[in-house]
Amino acid sequence: MARYCGPKNRIARRFGANIFGRSRNPLLKKPHPPGQHGMQRKKKSDYGLQLEEKQKLKACYGMILEKQLVKAFKEVVHKQGSVTKMFLERFECRLDNMVYRMGFAKTIFAAQQLVAHGHVLVNGKKVDRRSFFLRPGMQVSLKEKSRKLQSVQESLENKDESSLPSYISLDKGNFKGELLMSPEQDQMEAQLPLPVDISVVCEFLSHRT
């Protein structure tokens, strides 16, 4: 599966936040935006603001690809209910993001690697597709051998269970977590490392799908 391989620190500096949860915060060394002397950008147009919100959302979930963004919007735009809530849920409930939220990996990118390399089980069966969509009641666990990975053990050891959103449960001892319910939009937005206007993203995509 295709994935983003570009410079991640530049993206964090662009948005002024350590959005990827790296232990070495790139903003400590270079707190200004990328570009010569962190030059100030010109005032953005409405299109530019929409584009920025879209880029922020993609970054929050581990550099989601454009085609994945468009596909998710097409899947929900004609359904009954809140389009913005269902759209955001498509990314919040991705397997790689749930692995990260549950604390099996320190960063979203480490979570993507765990899934892609076959370390993760869903309801006891191996799933190596990062974009796999979890539904309420589905359990996420790790293979027996994978539980011995130092990176996994360190990540779980440092995971504060009180920081878990209410729609997720975690059993550290058994290396198992569960998606308990469909999250509300405000709950999902609270988990994002920087604020994103989801309605603006959906408006942007509505003109391009």
From Swiss-Prot:
Cystine bridges: none
Keyword rRNA-binding: yes
Source superkingdom: Bacteria
InterPro entries assigned to the protein according to its UniProt record, in alphabetical order: Ribosomal_uS4 (IPR022801), Ribosomal_uS4_bac-type (IPR005709), Ribosomal_uS4_N (IPR001912), S4_RNA-bd (IPR002942), S4_RNA-bd_sf (IPR036986)
Pfam families xrefs: Ribosomal_S4 (PF00163), S4 (PF01479)
Gene3D superfamilies attached to this UniProt entry: Ribosomal Protein S4 Delta 41, Chain A, domain 1, RNA-binding S4 domain
UniProt entry keywords in alphabetical sequence: Ribonucleoprotein, Ribosomal protein, RNA-binding, rRNA-binding
Function: One of the primary rRNA binding proteins, it binds directly to 16S rRNA where it nucleates assembly of the body of the 30S subunit. With S5 and S12 plays an important role in translational accuracy.
Transmembrane parts of this sequence: none
Chain positions covered by the region annotation Disordered: 23-46
Residues covered by the S4 RNA-binding domain: 93-156
Name of this chain's protein: Small ribosomal subunit protein uS4
One of the GO biological process terms: translation
GO CC terms of this entry: small ribosomal subunit
Single GO term (MF): structural constituent of ribosome
Family: Belongs to the universal ribosomal protein uS4 family.
Any coiled-coil regions, as ranges: none
Complexes and interactors: Part of the 30S ribosomal subunit. Contacts protein S5. The interaction surface between S4 and S5 is involved in control of translational fidelity.
